A protein has these predicted regions:
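Structural/interface elements that position substrates and couple domains in central-metabolism enzymes
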Residues: 1-432
Length: 432
């Protein structure tokens, strides 16, 4: 089977590389000729553990190709994945212009039966929108099926998530398209991955609902953490106490500076927008969004209480990406926190193991260190924002001795409060 993936960003590249690893013949297409040129030279446009190796392996094997030639890719493919961006508009709804453009390309070059699959996160009704657009613009009488096959990839663990998914959601009313999709995912039968076969609309809503629910857990535990700060108890004890309940589960009950990235902020706002379009209030989702917005200010207040007046102070920030094992700076909590610090007159020196190049684009006016110890030298305070594993193994005695003032705001609760205080640090965590 030959498939085409239109869009070679995070979702498209991981999807293409993983299907190629399954043995499928894959062509990844992108209108960005510089991105395609870099991919042809083995240079990844994103950081994702294991992806560079997977791309190189399957490119060398001849199963994975990159091109800007949409026509050739569409004409050769039986299944065409649309994995283009859906950035938010000012009202929170997704911009579908890239999806429309990709669907128009499929219509223009359709030369036989095709399965057109939305891999991008799209609002309810997009599948039918694509069907109508292709029907209006196709130049042949060829039939086609439309499928919603949302991705549930975690940045930093995307390859494992694709290869060993919790479930595969396939939404369509076309039985032939469903059969082809099942065949495409046949390698997953060996690990008995469950399949959810449903309507286009239910599949589209499933993606939004899943991310909104996970975001709800994050905002909930952050509210509990803020309450723990006032009460004087440890949020981790509370999280363990509720997380052991099988109805709740322990995942996503980790307090911190709030959620960021390409999914949770965008998808919660999009779900709220969709609800309004259908005349429905989304009270819980709206509250989740507000709690997350407020959390950045809560973290800044925590730093201010620790440090005092920030004018002229040097603050070291460790961790910039929205989570470990990625260079993704989209809506990263570090952005708002650092902007608060600099607006208050502090100077910021930051370090992140992989996100510097992306961080410079959104935070061009701060200093960037070569390593953790370079960042903390002469600092009036250290702020942990992203919980990279290497930050858990720092020589904290050396860190203390390098700092001007041994004050730590640990926004990811990487270290134990008592241990830090015994070492001579003035330490604050989140909900501890």
């Amino acid at each position: 089977m030959h498939i085409a993936v239109i869009g070679s960003g995070y979702v498209g590249l991981v999807t293409g590389a993983c299907f190629a690893e399954f043995g499928v013949d894959v062509t990844c297409v992108d209108v960005d000729d510089q991105k395609i040129e870099r991919l042809l030279n083995g240079v990844m446009p994103i950081y994702e553990p294991g992806l560079e190796h997977l791309v190189a392996k399957n490119t060398q094997a001849g199963r994975l190709r990159f091109t800007t030639d949409v026509r050739q890719a569409v004409e050769q493919a039986l299944v065409i994945f649309l994995a283009v961006g859906t950035p938010p508009l000012p009202d929170g709804s997704p911009d579908l212009s890239y999806v429309d453009s990709a669907a128009a390309s499929v219509a223009q070059y359709m030369n036989g039966y095709k399965v057109v699959v939305t891999k991008s996160t799209v609002p309810i009704g997009t599948g039918e929108r694509i069907r109508s657009l292709i029907n209006e613009r196709k130049k042949t009488r060829a039939n086609f099926g439309v499928v919603s096959n949302p991705e549930f990839l975690r940045e930093g663990a995307a390859i494992n998530d694709f290869m060993r998914p919790d479930r595969v959601v396939i939404g369509s009313r076309d039985e032939e398209a469903i059969a082809i999709m099942k065949d495409l995912y046949r390698p997953l039968y060996l690990i008995e991955a469950p399949f959810v076969i449903t309507s286009l609309e239910a599949a589209e809503l499933t993606k939004y609902a899943a991310n909104a629910f996970l975001a709800t857990k994050v905002s909930f535990i952050n509210e509990i953490a803020n309450l723990c700060d006032k009460i004087g108890c440890d949020v981790h004890d509370v999280a363990r106490g509720i997380g052991m309940d099988k109805r709740i589960g322990s995942k996503f009950l980790h307090p911190g500076p709030g959620f960021g990235g390409s999914c949770f902020p965008k998808d919660t706002r999009a779900l709220s927008s969709v609800a309004r379009q259908f005349g429905n209030e989304s009270l819980i989702v709206d509250a989740v969004i507000e709690v997350n917005r407020r959390q950045s200010s809560e973290m800044f207040a925590k730093i201010g209480k620790l440090v005092g007046p920030l004018e002229g102070k040097k603050i070291a920030v460790l961790g910039l990406a929205f989570k470990p094992e990625t260079d993704d700076m989209r809506e990263a909590p570090a952005i708002g926190i650092i902007q608060h610090l600099t607006e208050s007159g502090a100077t910021v020196t930051a370090y992140d193991p992989v996100a510097k190049d992306e961080a410079v684009k959104v935070l061009p006016d701060i200093s960037y260190a070569d390593d953790e110890y370079d960042a903390v030298a002469g600092a009036d305070a250290l702020v942990f924002v992203t919980e990279w594993n290497q930050f858990r193994a720092l020589d904290m005695t050396r860190v203390r001795d390098l700092m001007k003032s041994p004050k730590v705001a640990d926004l990811r609760n990487i270290y134990e409060p008592e241990d830090m205080r015994e070492m001579g640090f003035e330490y604050v965590g989140v909900g501890r």
